[in-house]
């Protein structure tokens, strides 16, 4: 299983104060020196709430690890990424909403202009991945547009697991739709969410599409996904950076890697 480390929230901390620290390149080399991280993931948002264009340029210039850039189909961002001398190893196209706290679901594959953006990256020799819900229609769209990789949105699975097996439902930001569900209901829905991820990962494999996954994964809920042999990559960020606040980034990375690289 490949481990993609999302370092957006290193930059979130920097941007809150509009200062120079923490330094994103230090995070990059801490990750590299663990010898456990396979790629670095960053999200270049339209609103630039964390990662900035300059961060992209600096990372691509010196990174010893592959860089996966998440982004919307925004024309300015597409033009910027297509113009780069140093190319990312892949671009993952994601949905985006300025009012969201984080990505709320998979990409709508009927989105106008999506096909053109895929072709624009392909013409520049950049691999494209689509961040999608684990649905067959999304896989058929990827196949039709010669996209060889998808990343399944694991938010539904992760939220259900957290509601059932952690104190998430008692926290200030508990998900209201899950608070009133019984443990039996949560367990059944969690099981179905896992089965859907497993089914679509297997479907992707038989279609010649590499299946990755990410969103909301943490040290507790990631373990079950290791039972899906056709999943090839997990992208994890917030949970690792959160733990790093208390134990340091190196240890936080190593603890996650120990779980997903058994």
Regions found by a protein language model. Name each.
Residues 74-87, 135-146, 211-213, 217-231:
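Catalytic cores of alpha/beta
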Residues 3-7, 40-42, 67-69, 89-93, ...:
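Hydrophobic faces of well-ordered beta-strands that scaffold small-molecule active sites
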Residues 91-100, 149-162, 230-249:
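Glycine-rich phosphate-binding active-site loops on the catalytic face of alpha/beta enzymes
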Residues 1-68, 74-86, 144, 165-171:
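Conserved N-terminal beta1-alpha1 strand-loop-helix module at the mouth
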Residues 133-193, 200-203:
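Histidine/lysine/aspartate-rich catalytic loop segments that bind and position anionic ligands
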Residues 162-178, 242-262:
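C-terminal helical cap(s) of enzyme catalytic domains, especially alpha/beta-barrels
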Residues 33, 49-75, 109-129, 174-212, ...:
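Alpha-helix-loop-beta-strand connector modules within alpha/beta enzyme cores
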Residues 3-25, 66-73, 100-108, 122-134, ...:
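Active-site mouth loops of central-metabolism enzymes
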């Amino acid at each position: 299983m490949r481990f993609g480390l999302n370092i957006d929230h290193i930059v979130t901390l920097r941007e809150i104060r509009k200062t120079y620290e923490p330094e994103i390149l230090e995070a990059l080399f801490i990750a590299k020196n663990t010898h456990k991280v396979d790629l670095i993931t960053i999200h270049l948002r339209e609103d630039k709430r964390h990662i900035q264009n300059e961060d992209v340029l600096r990372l691509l210039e010196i990174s010893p690890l592959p860089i996966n850039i998440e982004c919307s189909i925004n024309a300015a961002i597409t033009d910027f990424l297509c113009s780069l001398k140093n190319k990312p190893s892949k671009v993952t196209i994601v949905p985006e909403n300025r009012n969201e706290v984080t990505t709320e679901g998979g990409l709508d594959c009927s989105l106008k202009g999506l096909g053109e953006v895929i072709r624009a990256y392909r013409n520049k020799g950049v691999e494209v991945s689509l961040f999608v819900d684990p649905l067959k229609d999304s896989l058929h769209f990827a196949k039709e547009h010669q996209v060889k990789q998808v990343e399944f949105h694991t938010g539904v699975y992760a939220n259900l697991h957290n509601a059932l097996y952690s104190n998430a439902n008692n926290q200030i930001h508990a998900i209201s739709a899950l608070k009133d569900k019984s443990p039996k209901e949560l367990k059944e829905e969690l099981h179905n969410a896992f089965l859907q991820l497993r089914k679509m990962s297997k479907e992707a494999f038989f279609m010649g599409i590499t299946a990755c996954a990410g969103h909301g994964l943490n040290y507790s809920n990631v373990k079950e996904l290791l039972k899906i042999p056709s999943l090839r990559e997990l992208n994890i960020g917030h949970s690792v950076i959160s733990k790093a606040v208390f134990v340091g980034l190196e240890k936080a990375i190593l603890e996650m890697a120990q779980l997903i690289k058994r």
